[in-house]
């Protein structure tokens, strides 16, 4: 079974406050006598389900076209942390990259999937992130708008992950996904030298 864990991208999809919202217009329409329908879109690449690039948090770091595809395909584990608030420590996860796959997907329950931008969401502690990266974490995905807190200006989790060659997915839709192991496929679009890239993220059930 393939499970779509991407947020539907449409006008009105909540954007990070201050970001350019997603918008679409029709450049040509068959109804107006044109031979084809052609649309044009505008918006921040952080609207909807996306992969952050290291360039997002530091000048000179790799852009969206340099994201390593292998980080976004492979074994992943969905962990439910919706009962938590504030900072989550490693012992509360019950997850080990060496035993459970190198990609961790957190269901916080604070998601834009319902049409509202959340005020807050739980995040991993810096010690937790350091420990996970040290044990081989390749990717952290969240259903929340960020792996850091809404108020953070220094974005320590972003910096620690990118410094450890681990990557980031944000705004996943994990509402109907049971916890446990999956195969993740979430390839970033090849936008050149941007701070993020949209993805169509899916999970494939693990057989046996």
Protein language model regions, located:
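Active-/binding-site microenvironments in catalytic and ligand-binding cores
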Residues: 1-208
């Amino acid at each position: 079974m393939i499970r779509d864990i991407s947020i539907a991208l449409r006008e009105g999809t909540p954007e990070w406050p201050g970001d350019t919202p997603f918008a679409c217009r029709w450049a040509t329409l068959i109804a107006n006598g044109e031979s084809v329908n052609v649309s044009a879109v505008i918006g921040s690449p952080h609207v909807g389900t996306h992969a952050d690039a290291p360039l997002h948090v530091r000048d000179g770091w790799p852009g969206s076209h340099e994201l390593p595809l292998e980080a976004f395909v492979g074994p992943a584990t969905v962990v439910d942390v919706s009962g938590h608030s504030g900072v989550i420590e490693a012992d509360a996860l019950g997850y080990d990259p060496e035993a459970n796959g190198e990609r961790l997907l957190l269901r916080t329950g604070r998601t834009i999937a319902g049409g509202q931008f959340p005020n807050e969401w739980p995040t991993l502690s810096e010690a937790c992130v350091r420990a996970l990266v040290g044990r081989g974490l390749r990717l952290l995905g969240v259903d929340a708008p960020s792996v850091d807190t809404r108020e953070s200006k220094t974005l320590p989790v972003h910096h620690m992950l990118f410094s450890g060659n681990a990557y980031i997915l944000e705004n996943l839709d994990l509402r109907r996904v049971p916890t446990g192991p999956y195969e993740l496929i979430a390839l970033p679009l090849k936008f050149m030298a941007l701070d993020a890239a949209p993805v169509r993220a899916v999970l494939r059930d693990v057989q046996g």
